[in-house]
């Protein structure tokens, strides 16, 4: 997923993104887009019920029309929500509002592994291992739970500002 963290924030009219400013599920006020991938975009959002900032992953328009794909998205969201690991983003909620299929997740301030590699390359082996150990631990936990990530790449690995 490509990071948009440094993109300018704005309104739907200013950015051309109709989701910005929208209220999903009468609960999530969508803010700035922070990442975009082939199947979905991720936005910073406010959970109005719990008064907290979350990440909302929204499938691109039309992706939810494929019933098999949408069903897999929901199954994987439910499975991911049961996964509790310090190096796995927590899934809080899942929904579908008028064809807008979404996940509400923990917002992890930080950068992608791709960003870290670009900034720190070449890096000592000890640093590379320190970055990869939590990733491998998270993947092992997911696999024990019967989950397969399907898209492990540096752009999809978050390195939190707090180091996790």
What are the residue ranges of the model-derived segments?
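Flexible N-lobe loop architecture of eukaryotic-like protein kinase catalytic domains
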Residues: 35, 75, 84-87, 100
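Activation segment signature within eukaryotic-like protein kinase domains
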Residues: 131-132
């Amino acid at each position: 997923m490509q990071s948009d963290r440094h993109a300018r924030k704005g309104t739907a009219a200013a950015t051309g993104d109709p989701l910005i400013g929208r209220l999903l599920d009468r609960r999530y006020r969508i803010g700035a887009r922070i990442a975009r991938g082939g199947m979905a975009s991720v936005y910073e959002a406010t959970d109005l019920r719990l008064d907290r900032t979350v990440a909302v992953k929204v499938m691109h328009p039309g992706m939810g029309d494929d019933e098999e794909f949408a069903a897999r998205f929901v199954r994987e969201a439910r499975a991911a929500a049961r996964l509790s690991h310090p190096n796995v983003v927590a899934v809080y909620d899942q929904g579908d509002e008028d064809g807008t299929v979404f996940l509400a997740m923990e917002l992890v301030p930080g950068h992608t592994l791709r960003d870290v590699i670009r900034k720190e390359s070449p890096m000592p082996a000890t640093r590379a291992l320190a970055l990869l150990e939590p990733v491998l631990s998270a993947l092992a936990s997911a696999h024990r739970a019967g989950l397969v990530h399907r898209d492990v790449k540096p752009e999809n690995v978050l390195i939190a500002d707090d180091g996790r």
